[in-house]
Amino acid sequence: MAYQAEYIWIDGTEPTHKLRSKTRVVPDGKKPPVWGFDGSSTNQATGHFSDCVLEPVFTCPDPLRGPNDVLVMCEVLNADLTPHPTNTRAAAVAVAKQYASFEPMFGIEQEYTFFQDGRPYGWPEVGFPAPQGPYYCGVGGTKMPGREIVEAHTLACLRAGLAVEGTNAEVMMGQWEFQVGVLSTVAVGDQLWTARWLLERIAEDFGVDVSFDAKPIKGDWNGAGAHTNFSTKQMRAAGGWDAIIAGCEALGTRVLEHIENYGDGIKDRLTGAHETAPWSKFSYGVSDRGSSVRIPGGVARDKRGYLEDRRPNANVDPYVVARLMVETICGAAASTKPAAKPTAKRAPATKAVAKKATARKAPARR
């Protein structure tokens, strides 16, 4: 019997890419094949040369359909099968291979806001709800609108086999969070984009929209972020504290590059208020949610673990944030590694007399 494959891809909408999808019926026993779409309708091509290619890269069970149906996350390619300019995954794959020896791992805390009829879900038609305070991790029918969608989304992610670690209500009414991880550089993007698609698709059934805007409501209301937890095997190992501090220092050397790629509207969110650091000032500290990068208290006690970059927006591309963090942190660590110790290389012995081996110094890494 044939099955349904829902092909999901990232479009070319600016300044924030959106998700698109369409269904293909695939014969039983066959894998989802390479497919295509009209790029002129997704801001990825012009009308006179509009063919774009969908290359399957991640497949998981479709929790919304039958037991044999699947979700298929795709890379977008040009007609000549080179990565499309909107394809940020390809660059993440290259960086992951380059720094594979560091074994970088990620966990991303995805915040978002439900909207209905142009205002946050559950807000009064006129005016505002009660000030922030009771909503974060709260409970109660009048304070927690959207929980039924959150529960359905969490169950769907689990049935799909996605590495969802948890959910919670956030500081502003109508705002929620789920966490994905711990996953490798590319896998965290594959699974977070898939989880985002499931969230929007499920909210659709409730007549509710999902916003990943960094500051969906102006004023004294929290923005929405995607705090990104990062570690290498050196950080996770006993005595990894020095590697964690080195990672924080490395992030401080490329501040503007990260800020410019951490999502649209970041300057509206990173103001120094509402548990953020000013976008223009880099800082890190233990247990400090007002810093750019937080080192959890438990990590400081254990002297090993991970760091949390609190700057990425909710609308950040996870492939981009993962690539940048690996490039910056692992790249800095690789450039400061000491040269290998010289080793003696023995020359082959002859029948007359064995030649004395001479030490050869290993070249320093550049």
Report residues per predicted region.
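Low-complexity, polybasic segments enriched for Lys interleaved with small residues
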Residues: 339, 343-364
